[in-house]
């Protein structure tokens, strides 16, 4: 087995060397998921459309090569490995800072056994066949397969991680190695742009130049950075003043907070989250320093959550609306919204989505999600009617796009009001699960690049939300123990 370096230049993108023999054809794939929300996260937050699977996409990659078996055709530094000799001669501050962590992670990587190799071959075959092992050609498209693989990898690595504590070294290594394999497909997604080129005779010609697609070039490095920040956040919870006790397993010594924080945390949580471990703090509560550190980490992680959510919403917004979704829309928008909401939206007075939401008195996020589905369906129903009523030639449509006549169309006005209502609803419930349209877009999407970005941002969004919720648990227990509530 070859020697492992202590520090490498590329650990910021989550790459670690495998000392074992490598077969470039040996990969693995995720288990076949079902499009339903998973419930391994904290509280009632669901942003994934694949159930937890025991499988993951495992592979071993040579340190001196690119993420794929052949050299990457792009000059994209984020997705390409660099020379290790240079990094060893000129170690960076990042290398020195994470030297000990890297050494521990490398020591955890063992040679792949024969059963593991066979499992990897089987899973990779399943990935290539679009999750259809029968070979009958009924598998899903590549985009959906990769999206499911990322979702299932997240569930495998983080599904049992329900505490504020560092990931085990093997889990962290698996996550970084397998994500690099799944993300390496983006090395080969390009767009062509015109570029002027001067010839030797002085003439100027226009040629097409390839470059990484704009959405991947912008969003993928950002997601990698968010991923790294979340791993650092978990690693920071090594020596803490709080600890955990599983519900129902509290001993007499650990029940010193049962009369205060233990029961109140149960009340604060959803009843269906009974399996989550209970955070415990000293009788006098956390120290001021520990409390400030927790609040600071909560704020930074919350910003990561917002960034991942913004990227995910942007990618979903760029996906085409599937014809299958449009075919299921009712003929009337009123049938989707219901009589009460429709009367308020068609009233002659000034429409206020905030007042409408106050009148509806939504008591749960489940009700909010149902309302979002109905409002979104009515919005596209009215938009479709507005297009049919204002069908014109292409030139006239461009000329009169924002005309007063079109603005006064009833369907157009109702569609705008439905859009504003949906926007306010999502603002009031920022952790709302994905709507039926979002899930349909993911299921019908055939763009591999968008599938990678959407699934990667979605799982990071879920992880960030969980960390924030776990920190809130600890702060709530601390507040209760100090007698502030």
Curated annotation (Swiss-Prot):
It comes from Arabidopsis thaliana (Mouse-ear cress). This is Rop guanine nucleotide exchange factor 2. Residues 107-485 form the PRONE domain. One of its GO terms (molecular function) is guanyl-nucleotide exchange factor activity. Guanine-nucleotide exchange factor (GEF) that acts as an activator of Rop (Rho of plants) GTPases by promoting the exchange of GDP for GTP. Gene3D superfamilies: PRONE domain, subdomain 1 (1.20.58.2010). The PRONE (plant-specific Rop nucleotide exchanger) domain is responsible for the GEF activity. The keyword Thylakoid does not apply. Pfam families: PRONE. Expressed in the vascular tissues of roots, leaves, sepals, petals and siliques. Residues 1-36 are annotated as: Disordered. Interacts with ARC10/ROP11. InterPro entries: PRONE_dom, RopGEF. Keywords: Guanine-nucleotide releasing factor. The keyword Ribosomal protein does not apply.
């Amino acid at each position: 087995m070859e020697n492992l370096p202590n520090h490498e230049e590329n650990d910021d993108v989550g790459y670690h060397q495998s000392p074992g023999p490598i077969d470039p054809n040996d990969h693995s794939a995720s288990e076949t998921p079902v499009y339903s929300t998973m419930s391994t996260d904290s509280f009632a937050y669901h942003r994934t459309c694949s159930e937890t699977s025991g499988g993951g996409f495992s592979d071993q990659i040579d340190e001196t090569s690119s993420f794929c078996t052949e050299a990457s055709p792009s000059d994209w530094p984020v997705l390409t490995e660099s020379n290790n000799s240079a990094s060893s001669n000129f170690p960076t501050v990042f290398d020195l800072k994470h030297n000990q962590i890297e050494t521990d992670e490398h020591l955890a990587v063992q040679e792949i056994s024969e059963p593991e190799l066979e499992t990897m071959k089987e899973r990779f075959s399943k990935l290539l066949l679009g999750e259809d092992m029968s070979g009958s050609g009924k598998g899903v498209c590549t985009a959906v397969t990769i999206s499911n693989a990322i979702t299932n990898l997240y569930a495998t690595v983080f599904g049992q991680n329900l505490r504020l504590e560092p990931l085990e070294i093997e889990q962290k290594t698996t996550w970084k190695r397998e994500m690099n394999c799944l993300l390496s497909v983006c090395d080969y997604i390009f767009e062509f742009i015109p570029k002027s080129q001067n010839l030797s005779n002085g003439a100027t010609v226009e040629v097409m130049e390839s470059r990484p697609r704009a959405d991947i070039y912008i969003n993928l490095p950002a997601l990698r950075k968010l991923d790294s920040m979340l791993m650092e956040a978990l690693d920071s919870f090594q020596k803490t003043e709080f600890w955990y006790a599983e519900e129902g397993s509290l001993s007499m010594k650990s029940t010193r907070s049962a009369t205060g924080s233990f029961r109140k945390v149960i009340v604060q949580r959803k009843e269906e989250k009974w399996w989550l471990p209970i955070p415990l703090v000293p009788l006098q509560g956390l120290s001021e320093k520990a409390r400030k550190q927790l609040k600071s980490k909560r704020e930074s992680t919350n910003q990561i959550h917002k960034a991942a959510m913004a990227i995910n919403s942007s990618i979903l917004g760029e996906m085409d609306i599937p014809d299958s979704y449009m075919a299921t829309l009712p003929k009337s928008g009123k049938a989707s919204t219901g009589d009460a909401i429709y009367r308020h939206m068609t009233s002659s007075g000034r429409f206020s989505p905030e007042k409408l939401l106050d009148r509806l008195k939504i008591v749960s996020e489940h009700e909010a999600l149902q309302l979002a589905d109905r409002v979104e369906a009515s919005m596209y129903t009215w938009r479709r009617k507005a297009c049919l009523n204002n069908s014109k030639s292409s030139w006239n449509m461009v000329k009169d796009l924002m005309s007063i006549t079109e603005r006064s169309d009833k369907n157009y006005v109702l569609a705008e009001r439905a859009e504003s209502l949906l926007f306010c609803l999502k603002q009031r419930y920022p952790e709302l699960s994905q709507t039926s349209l979002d899930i349909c877009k993911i299921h019908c999407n055939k763009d591999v690049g968008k599938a990678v970005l959407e699934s990667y941002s979605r799982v990071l969004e879920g992880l960030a939300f969980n960390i924030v919720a776990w920190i809130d648990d600890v702060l709530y227990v601390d507040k209760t123990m100090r007698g502030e509530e």
